[in-house]
């Protein structure tokens, strides 16, 4: 009986690989997550002390997520990820997060905060389903597109991926959460493009999607006020413009080399969400422009290892999975940086691996474990190099 159980377990995990994986993926992930713990302490210790009576309040929660994330990353690094493309698993990966997104609106289960209902709470446990939905979509889209490389040559073949991504976006936008909606929308378009969708089909989707953005902004008064505050935050310095002004103050105060670690001024209740969505502002204040550049260099190195893993992937499914995982991390990092610097209107999107939030941390670390597992199966020049020697399908 025990032997049968071990056989079942070994079907979804692998004890070793002939070719060792790219350990820099694991190292960079752990480094960024560990740096995040330090940054969270610096950004939150004053608020945690005054509000909860414990300056380590947010750090303790993040350390728990860090520990669980390490376990999840270890497990996923040994995962036989090819099992994820099975019909049953791909649909579970898509449908389960959508069910959880629906439960967000059930009274007594969904948790609201700052006018948005984005979390599920059971007892003392809180889960943000939109974080699961991003990777669930990656699994479904990768498995679907990998079944037939020519599937996306017709618009009919594109529709299942479009409907899956659109359904997730719809559930997320009514929370409301426009930032994650944008993230999933960009992820969907990028994966379809990587999968070989024709340019004309890409434009058929892209143009209406871009036209829908201003409609979504106008449809909600709070989004319109945020847009106005983005254009000129000093018109409402104590209202919608306050967050952006304080973020810019933090970055400006940091200068080239920063005020020094743990010496932020803006964390003293001047900058809201300093430990979460706007933690990059505190990092910029304490470590300066040079510190932010170093952080982006490390994040960029992780993205580059993901791109390299995708290029050397053993098959189309592996290529798409690595591409999707890298896109989620890269898109979210870029959007967060643009928001903090005032380059786009403020949205609630955490900086992956660094911002406070266990759901995002654990799932991101788990995804990097899958990326490592894919890198361990790379073969020579990889599937991408072979594919690029052929005439690209989307330009025909």
Predicted segments, located by residue:
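Membrane-helix boundary/helix-loop-helix interface segments in multi-pass membrane proteins
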Residues: 2-27, 31-32, 38-175, 337-356, ...
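Hydrophobic alpha-helical transmembrane segments
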Residues: 64-72, 286-303
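Transmembrane alpha-helix boundary/anchor motif
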Residues: 71, 79, 140, 218-222, ...
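Hydrophobic alpha-helical segments of polytopic membrane proteins
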Residues: 89-98, 155-173, 178-218
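Hydrophobic, glycine- and aromatic-enriched re-entrant/interface helices and adjoining loop segments
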Residues: 110-119, 123, 201-294, 313-321
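Interfacial segments of multi-pass membrane proteins
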Residues: 145, 187-201, 265-287, 291, ...
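Membrane-interface helix-loop-helix junctions at transmembrane boundaries of multi-pass membrane enzymes
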Residues: 151-158, 201, 307-327, 383
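Loop-to-helix entry and N-terminal half of a specific, functionally important transmembrane alpha helix
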Residues: 309-348, 354
């Amino acid at each position: 009986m025990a032997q049968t159980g071990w056989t079942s377990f070994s079907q979804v995990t692998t004890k070793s690989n002939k070719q060792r994986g790219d350990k820099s993926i694991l190292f960079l992930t752990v480094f960024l997550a560990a740096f995040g713990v330090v940054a969270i302490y610096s950004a939150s210790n004053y608020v945690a002390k005054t509000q909860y009576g414990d300056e380590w309040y947010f750090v303790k929660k993040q350390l728990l997520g860090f520990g669980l994330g390490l376990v999840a990353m270890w497990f996923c690094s040994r995962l036989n990820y090819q099992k994820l493309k099975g019909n049953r698993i791909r649909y579970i990966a898509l449908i389960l997060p959508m069910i959880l997104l629906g439960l967000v609106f059930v009274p007594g289960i969904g948790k609201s905060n700052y006018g948005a209902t984005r979390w599920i709470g059971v007892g003392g446990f809180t889960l943000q389903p939109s974080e699961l939905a991003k990777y669930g979509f990656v699994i479904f889209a990768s498995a679907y597109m990998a079944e037939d490389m020519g599937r996306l040559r017709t618009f009919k073949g594109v529709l299942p991926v479009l409907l899956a991504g659109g359904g997730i976006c719809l559930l997320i936008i009514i929370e409301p959460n426009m930032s994650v909606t944008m993230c999933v929308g960009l992820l969907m378009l990028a994966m379809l493009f990587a999968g070989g969708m024709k340019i004309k089909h890409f434009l058929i989707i892209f143009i209406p999607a871009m036209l829908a953005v201003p409609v979504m902004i106008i449809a909600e008064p709070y989004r319109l006020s945020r847009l106005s505050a983005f254009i000129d935050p000093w018109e409402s310095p104590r209202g919608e413009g306050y967050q952006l002004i304080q973020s810019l103050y933090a970055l400006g105060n940091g200068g080239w080399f920063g005020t020094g670690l743990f010496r932020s001024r803006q964390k003293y209740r001047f900058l809201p969400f300093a430990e979460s969505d706007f933690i990059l502002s505190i990092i910029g204040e304490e470590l300066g422009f040079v510190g932010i550049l170093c952080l982006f260099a490390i994040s960029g190195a992780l993205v580059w290892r993901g791109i390299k893993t995708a290029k050397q992937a053993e098959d189309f499914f592996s290529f798409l999975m690595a591409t999707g995982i890298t896109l989620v991390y890269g898109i979210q990092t870029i959007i967060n940086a643009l928001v903090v610097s005032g380059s786009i209107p403020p949205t609630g999107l955490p900086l992956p691996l660094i911002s406070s939030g266990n759901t995002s941390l654990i799932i991101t670390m788990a995804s990097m474990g899958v990326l490592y597992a894919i890198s361990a199966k790379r073969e020579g020049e990889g599937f991408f190099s072979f594919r690029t020697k052929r005439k690209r399908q989307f330009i025909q």
